[in-house]
């Protein structure tokens, strides 16, 4: 497995994009910062957590973390701003792309993992990640997610980050595909 993060630098600030396991989404109306570690414990062992990340994504607070070793190697970067890859791409779609599709599946491939979120009628329905083995594996999961949430592939755009041409071509046989490049 590769690095659990990558770094974007801009005007003296380092933006650290975390690409490890999916964040926990807590509805804003229920979120209490005093219980942030409890939220993470629902799904993860946080005994080695070094830095806890908290972001807003639609009506939710996204909570994830870097372990102590990962965090220690980043302490040399000042100032720094942490964000999970899912939140980062969500913000790009909502702030940068003028005519974002109402029904969309955003896929970000990081090593053997794909991070994704699904929106239907401009409402966030799902944030998760899946271990992957091939482009066909990604195609299967993408179509399965759309089917499970009642999203017609003909009425959906897949926003693809870090995908290859073969994957884009496979997906485009079923739905519209837009490549997201961060450079």
Write out the residue ranges for each language-model feature:
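Hydrophobic/aromatic-enriched cytosolic interaction surfaces used to assemble or bind macromolecules
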Residues: 1-183
């Amino acid at each position: 497995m590769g690095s659990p993060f990558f770094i974007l630098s801009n005007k003296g600030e380092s933006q650290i994009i975390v690409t490890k396991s999916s964040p926990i989404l807590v509805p804003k109306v229920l979120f209490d910062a005093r219980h942030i570690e409890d939220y993470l414990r629902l799904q993860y062992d946080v005994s080695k957590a070094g830095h806890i990340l908290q972001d807003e994504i639609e009506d939710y607070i996204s909570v994830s973390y870097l372990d102590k070793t990962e965090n220690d190697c980043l302490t040399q970067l000042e100032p720094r701003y942490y964000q999970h890859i899912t939140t980062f791409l969500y913000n790009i779609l909502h702030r940068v792309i003028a005519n974002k599709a109402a029904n969309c599946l955003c896929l970000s491939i990081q090593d053997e993992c794909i991070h994704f979120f699904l929106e239907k009628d401009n409402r966030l329905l799902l944030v998760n990640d899946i271990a992957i083995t091939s482009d066909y594996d990604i195609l299967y999961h993408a179509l399965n997610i759309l089917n499970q949430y009642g999203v017609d592939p003909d009425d959906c755009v897949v926003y693809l980050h870090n995908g290859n041409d073969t994957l884009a071509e496979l997906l485009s046989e079923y739905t519209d595909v837009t490549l997201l490049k961060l450079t």
